[in-house]
């Protein structure tokens, strides 16, 4: 599982700027979840081989007792509880405050790994103006400038170094997956019906479930079998033990959702027909796409809406989730057990598509046929020339195309190629990534 880093500190010390640096973005992939918009933002980043999740929090006053400040304190405490390491941000220019002392006292009491960061330290003599922060009792002070990117790499080295992370395993992209269980995550916002659907499945299959071994950061996974196909159901709804089996309860955790999506082979994205497509649905869908996971859409509570509402909902899905056009969509009622059979078929089909093997001769033939049908547009004196294609990975499938001047290939032409490949290999329910590798000889592709 990806380690989780929480940024805490009093208001206006530069946490959000640092967050944007750590995620290399001005808007995290998963941000502004409903009910958390002013308090917690979630994003992801990478340092070398290690990926991580970052939580940005509102200004923290541990002892706040009323109003918005109490809610912000509660949200920050939740972020700290979710985190593996805390980055405590102070303002190097304004110096230490009573609030900093209160936050440090709270963090010392928790005993969680912590990195003390003095932001806005650009142009300051190192060590001279930061001495007072040693009084906080959290060890060395790391000067950084989030605005200029100074010290950010050192910050990540310190934060991740405290966790003794193992080297990420190099997965064989062509490992035989036929005999492995399909890892399935049911994702969706709170009260969309995840727990009802999971409990329906568990009840149907009369499962004996158990915790899989792993670290405390691991999501619970429940192994089960259906029609001869083995699955592992990865928890996002909050599975609790009931005797020798699990039942699901509604318990929404952004971090758990992100980690469960990362751990999955296939994500079943559940949408509430009575609520329509919300911003939160779109954010989760965006994270699924960015993670490269196979995905199936299921619109739950379909029996609770009339024909007009159904038409409007279908249009909304086509518009707001247009980037998931490749995903099969089902209309179900988890409570009444309607539409669940075809849903299983699509889950298996999506996994098959995500892990299919595409021979180089077939890919190259398809590429040549596509080029013959529609030649890439010429840009200036250069025209992209495509030579051959091969598979570069699975789950999601990656097709690598080699040639000359491929940097001039338009996004529209890439979509054209994607459509041809999808049709040939029946790639339903999975993202498809196309990588272009061009010759570095600037004269190789000039039109004479």
From Swiss-Prot:
Keywords: GTP-binding, Nucleotide-binding, Repeat, Ribosome biogenesis. The keyword GTP-binding applies. GTP 1 binds at residues 9-16, 56-60, 119-122. One of its GO terms (biological process) is ribosome biogenesis. InterPro entries: G_ENGA, GTP-bd, GTPase_Der, KH_dom-like, KH_dom-like_a/b, P-loop_NTPase, Small_GTP-bd. PROSITE patterns: G_ENGA. SUPFAM superfamilies: P-loop containing nucleoside triphosphate hydrolases. CDD domains: EngA1, EngA2. It comes from the Bacteria. Gene3D superfamilies: 3.30.300.20, P-loop containing nucleotide triphosphate hydrolases. The keyword Nucleotide-binding applies. Associates with the 50S ribosomal subunit. GTPase that plays an essential role in the late steps of ribosome biogenesis. Belongs to the TRAFAC class TrmE-Era-EngA-EngB-Septin-like GTPase superfamily. EngA (Der) GTPase family. This is GTPase Der. It comes from Delftia acidovorans (strain DSM 14801 / SPH-1).
């Amino acid at each position: 599982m990806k380690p989780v880093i929480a940024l805490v500190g009093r208001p206006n010390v530069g946490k959000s700027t640092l967050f944007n640096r750590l995620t290399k973005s001005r808007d995290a992939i998963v941000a502004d979840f409903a009910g958390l918009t002013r308090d917690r933002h979630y994003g992801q980043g990478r340092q070398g081989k290690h990926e991580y999740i970052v939580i940005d929090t509102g200004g923290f006053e541990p002892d706040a007792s009323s109003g918005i400040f109490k809610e912000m304190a509660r949200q920050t405490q939740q972020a700290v509880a979710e985190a593996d390491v805390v980055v405590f941000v102070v303002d190097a220019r304004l110096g230490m405050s009573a609030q900093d002392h209160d936050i440090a006292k709270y963090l010392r009491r928790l005993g969680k790994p912590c990195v003390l960061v003095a932001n806005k330290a650009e142009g300051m003599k190192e060590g001279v103006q930061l001495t007072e922060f040693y009084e906080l009792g959290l060890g060395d002070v790391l000067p950084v400038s989030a605005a200029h990117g100074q010290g950010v790499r050192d910050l990540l080295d310190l934060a991740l170094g405290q966790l003794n992370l193992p080297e990420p395993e190099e997965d064989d992209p062509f490992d035989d997956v036929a005999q492995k269980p399909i890892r399935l995550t049911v994702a969706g916002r709170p009260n969309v019906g995840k727990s009802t659907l999971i409990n329906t499945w568990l009840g149907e299959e009369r499962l004996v479930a158990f915790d899989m071994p792993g670290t405390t950061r691991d999501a619970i996974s429940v192994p089960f079998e259906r029609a001869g196909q083995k699955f592992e159901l990865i928890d996002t709804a909050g599975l609790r033990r009931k005797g020798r089996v699990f039942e699901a309860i509604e318990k929404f955790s952004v971090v758990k959702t992100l980690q469960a999506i990362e751990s999955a082979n296939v994500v079943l994205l559940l949408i509430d027909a009575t609520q329509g497509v919300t911003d939160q649905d779109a954010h989760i869908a965006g994270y699924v796409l960015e993670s490269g996971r196979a995905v199936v859409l299921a619109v739950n509570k379909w029996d609770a809406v009339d024909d007009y509402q159904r038409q409007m909902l279908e249009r909304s899905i086509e518009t707001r989730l247009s980037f998931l056009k490749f995903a099969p969509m089902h209309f179900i009622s988890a409570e009444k057990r309607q539409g669940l059979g075809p849903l299983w078929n699509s889950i298996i089909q999506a996994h098959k598509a995500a892990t299919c093997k595409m021979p180089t001769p077939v890919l190259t033939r398809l590429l040549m046929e596509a080029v013959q049908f529609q030649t890439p547009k010429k840009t200036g004196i250069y025209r992209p020339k495509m030579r051959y294609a091969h598979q570069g990975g699975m789950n999601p499938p990656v097709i690598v195309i080699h040639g000359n001047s491929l940097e001039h290939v338009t996004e529209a032409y890439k979509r054209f190629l994607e459509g041809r490949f999808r049709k040939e290999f029946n790639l339903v329910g999975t993202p498809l990534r196309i990588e272009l590798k061009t010759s570095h000889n600037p004269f190789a592709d000039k039109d004479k």
